[in-house]
Curated annotation (Swiss-Prot):
It comes from Clostridium novyi (strain NT). SUPFAM superfamilies: Actin-like ATPase domain. A monovalent cation. Ammonium or potassium. ATP binds at D6, A7, G8, N9, T10, N11, I12, V13, T132. The lineage of its organism: Bacteria, Bacillati, Bacillota, Clostridia, Eubacteriales. Belongs to the type III pantothenate kinase family. It is found in: Cytoplasm. Pathway: Cofactor biosynthesis; coenzyme A biosynthesis; CoA from (R)-pantothenate: step 1/5. The keyword Protein transport does not apply. This is Type III pantothenate kinase.
Length: 259
């Protein structure tokens, strides 16, 4: 079995693969104060609860956008699984040609998503990842990573509204049936959710224009991350939601580097 970990700003997403099949996906809260032992105990509990024997895990791969937790995560893997993990970064084979001004500055999660999407679709792509930040990435048919855009995530956008406007309450992020709303909560939901959908569709339309101008043709638009389902319901530009895109990318990269 293969153990894949994607450490984000809010959550660490864990996956267990048996061959090419994802047999377990679960999450831990990201906490820089947590020790390797604390992470180890939590991970072993999750595996035990799902009837997975740690001795069956033969490889581990990690991607992270949170540098200050990496010592604990890597030490946890070595101590509790007796495995040296592959860590996505410089020197790791991805099959993606990064056309960024400084390739080392691209977030590991963005590269991992690009690897998965290119392996799955082999066509011009726009990849949207709805995480703590929302990222937009453009990938060519042959696998060149062109770059993209980074925006505040929908939760960050909502939190800014709650914190800066004293009389506005915290709300659940759901899509109301109308934009013309009759109460404060629904009005806020409409503004945040429909406003974010508008942002997505406009940014994607601009990326499409630029990719077409480069001769790539019309890109296929895929979305992943916690709010992909909510936004895709109303978006005019998202073609497909891939909820486990990052985990799949880690599996593909592991296969390229395990020899």
């Amino acid at each position: 079995m293969l153990f894949v970990l994607d450490a984000g700003n809010t959550n660490i997403v864990l996956g267990i693969y048996k061959g090419k099949e994802l047999v377990l996906e679960c999450r831990l809260g990201t906490d820089a104060k947590r020790t390797a032992d604390e992470y180890g105990i939590q991970v072993l509990k999750l595996l035990s609860h799902n009837n997975i024997d740690p001795k069956d895990i033969e490889g581990v791969i990690i991607s992270s956008v949170v540098p200050n937790i990496m010592y604990s995560i890597e030490h946890m893997i070595r101590k509790y699984f007796k495995i040296d993990p592959i860590v996505v970064g410089p020197g790791v084979k991805t099959g993606i040609n990064i056309k960024y001004d400084n390739p080392k500055s691209v977030g590991a999660d963005r590269i991992v998503n690009a690897v998965a999407a290119h392996a799955l679709f082999e066509k011009p792509l726009v990849i949207i990842d709805f995480g703590t930040a929302t990222t937009y990435c453009a990938v060519t048919k042959k696998g060149d990573y062109l770059g993209g855009a980074i925006c505040p995530g929908i939760k960050i956008s909502a939190a800014a509204l709650f914190e800066k406007a004293a009389k506005l309450p915290r709300i659940e992020l759901i899509k109301p049936p109308h934009v013309i709303c009759k109460n404060t909560v629904s009005s806020m939901q409409a503004g945040i959710v429909y406003g974010y959908i508008g942002q997505v569709d406009y940014i994607v339309s601009k990326i499409k224009e630029e990719m077409i101008a480069l001769g790539e043709g019309e890109p296929y638009v895929i979305a992943t991350g916690g709010f992909a389902g909510l936004i895709s319901e109303e978006s005019k530009t998202i073609d497909e939601v891939c909820p486990f895109l990052t985990l799949e990318g880690l599996r593909v990269i592991y296969e390229k580097n395990k020899e």
